[in-house]
């Protein structure tokens, strides 16, 4: 696939690795006879290591077929996380090192997960934009401090720690943005 045909989300092979394109910058310098250059910000699959590379418009990058299978988190088997395909109930096992920091957002029965599969092998997961987690430990609200919105630390049921508004109490369910790791509101 030529560099000028690549779109965000495409999965390509580069330098012996497999990468997913996350961002594209196009530049056409005036002094080079109109040769358009593309700068790709891509992340390795699996692993998520960031790579920044530039290509000419006619550079060729082989495209890799990546399937995204909607799945539900099932259980943890030793150090591996097991996800169940929502359509055909295929179990996908991914090691804790592949899941990485996303493990802090995964709870029993979590739905809306996409397992990324290359050649029938699960290589990565894509979590929903927000997940609902329970606050298990946070300091009480300070009386008289309502004029300022000071955040306070809160430990969640998965072990994750985030900053929450003062009015959040122990036992409350909160929405957490899986991209930024920040408080996104109260859960219903």
From Swiss-Prot:
GO terms for cellular component: cytoplasm. One of its GO terms (molecular function) is translation elongation factor activity. It comes from the Bacteria. SMART domains: EFP, Elong-fact-P_C. One of its GO terms (biological process) is peptide biosynthetic process. InterPro entries: Elong-fact-P_C, NA-bd_OB-fold, Rib_uL2_dom2, Transl_elong_fac_P/YeiP, Transl_elong_KOW-like, Transl_elong_p-like_YeiP, Transl_elong_P/YeiP_cen, Transl_elong_P/YeiP_CS. PANTHER family: ELONGATION FACTOR P, TRANSLATION ELONGATION FACTOR KOW-LIKE DOMAIN-CONTAINING PROTEIN. Belongs to the elongation factor P family. NCBIfam families: PRK00529.1, PRK04542.1, yeiP. This is Elongation factor P-like protein. It comes from Xanthomonas campestris pv. campestris (strain ATCC 33913 / DSM 3586 / NCPPB 528 / LMG 568 / P 25).
């Amino acid at each position: 696939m030529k560099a000028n045909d690549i779109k965000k989300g495409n999965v390509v092979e580069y330098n012996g690795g497999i990468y997913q394109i996350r961002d594209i910058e196009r530049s056409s310098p005036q002094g080079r006879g109109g040769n358009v250059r593309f700068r790709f910000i891509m992340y390795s699959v699996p692993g998520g290591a960031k790579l920044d590379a530039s290509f000419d418009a006619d550079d060729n990058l082989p495209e890799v077929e990546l399937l995204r299978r909607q799945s539900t988190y099932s259980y943890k088997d030793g150090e591996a996380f097991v996800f169940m395909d929502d359509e055909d109930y295929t179990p996908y096992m991914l090691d804790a090192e592949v899941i990485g920091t996303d493990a802090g957002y995964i709870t029993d029965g979590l739905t809306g997960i996409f397992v990324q599969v290359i050649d029938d092998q699960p290589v990565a997961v894509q979590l929903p934009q927000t997940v609902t987690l329970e606050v298990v430990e946070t300091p009480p609200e300070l009386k008289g401090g309502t004029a300022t919105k000071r955040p306070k630390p809160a430990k969640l049921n998965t072990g994750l720690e985030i900053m929450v508004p003062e009015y959040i109490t122990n036992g409350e369910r909160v929405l957490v943005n899986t991209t930024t790791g920040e408080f996104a509101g109260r859960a219903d």
